[in-house]
Amino acid sequence: MAFTGNFFCTSFKDELLEGVHDFRLTSGDVFKLALYTNSASFTAATTAYTATNEVTASGSYSAGGGTLTNVSPTVSGTTAFTDFADLTFTTATITARGALIYNTTPAHTYTNPTCVVLDFGSDRSSTAGDFTIVFPTADASNAIIRIA
């Protein structure tokens, strides 16, 4: 079974209420993005990072993925949101169908809890070049993580 859509992981919603994730730019947690092949099977029930079906290390992409740069959480109207800076893996030969965003330093006993499942809709590839994850605009309508 392949990716089936974009999801906030159900466990992530619970962990927000437990105070597990800190998205602040300074002194916040460390979040990573790992890339996966079309053989990966993730849904909203996904709870933690796994190396199963992760793309092979290439160029600047290594096992576990890349570290994300947080964009400080903010509020617009009644919507709170946060986002990440775009992430580029250089000189990489990669074919990925989707990604997981997960927390490597949670304020709890969880191990690498997942936050978001991203489905690219189809395979995306680079050959000895840049593989870039472009995050949406950090605003109340578009940010990757929004709570309305």
Which ranges hold each PLM region?
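Small cysteine-rich, disulfide-bonded extracellular modules of the LU/uPAR three-finger superfamily
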Residues: M1-R97, T104-A148
